[in-house]
Amino acid sequence: MYPEQLVAPMKAELANAGFTELTTPEAVEAFMKKPGTSMIVINSVCGCAAGTARPGVRKSLEHSKLPAHLGTVFAGVDKEAVNKAREYTLPYPPSSPAIAVFKDGNLVHFVERHHIEGRSADMIATHLKMVYDEL
């Protein structure tokens, strides 16, 4: 588990952009019961989360069509919440960072770490905006 003082700024990047921090399995379950479209970002301390995933996700919110609900869990910190979120992303293997988009609790799109690595924040933002347009 990472120290809170290390991850606090990384969590804040998404929380300040309007994401709800889901720190318990119960919070994830309640979030997933919300009707409509939702997105959960599985945040992490890795370089690709800092360099492209979080900036790309934030930039994607500069769009006319967005998921109604935004949530985030943090790998290596909120273990039980992350495990619960990953139940909703099956059959995909565990991945962090990752971005999951849901409609009425059903997974409709999943961006795994290997789709994030080597791509710019702008590429991730553009991709997510196209996903939002399909919702």
Swiss-Prot record:
Name of the protein described by the UniProt record: Bacilliredoxin CHU_0972
Transmembrane segments: none
A Pfam family assignment: Disulph_isomer
Annotated family: Belongs to the bacilliredoxin family.
Taxonomic source organism: Cytophaga hutchinsonii (strain ATCC 33406 / DSM 1761 / CIP 103989 / NBRC 15051 / NCIMB 9469 / D465)
InterPro entries named in the record: BrxB/BrxA
Superkingdom, natural source: Bacteria
Residues spanning the signal sequence: none
One GO biological process term: cell redox homeostasis
